[in-house]
From Swiss-Prot:
The keyword Signal applies. The peptide is disordered in aqueous solution. It is found in: Secreted; Membrane. Antimicrobial peptide with potent activity against Gram-positive and Gram-negative bacteria. Activity against E.coli and B.subtilis. Weaker activity against L.mucor, s.marcescens and P.aeruginosa. May play a role in innate host defense. GO terms for cellular component: extracellular region; membrane. InterPro entries: Antimicrobial12. Pfam families: Antimicrobial12 (PF08107). Its main location: secreted. This is Pleurocidin. The gene is ple1.
Amino acid sequence: MKFTATFLMMAIFVLMVEPGECGWGSFFKKAAHVGKHVGKAALTHYLGDKQELNKRAVDEDPNVIVFE
């Protein structure tokens, strides 16, 4: 019975709290900000490698066959 009463009181408390009254909002904003930076860094790293591979492919054109 104590568990049920505690659970109900906690549920009511959670439902009555406004979203801006806790620290979770700033936590999620900071997490999203960090996620954007990490994603951008990963994409830049991936595309940087990709561009170097494309440069090599242009330099060594497989369609040109030269016999020496």
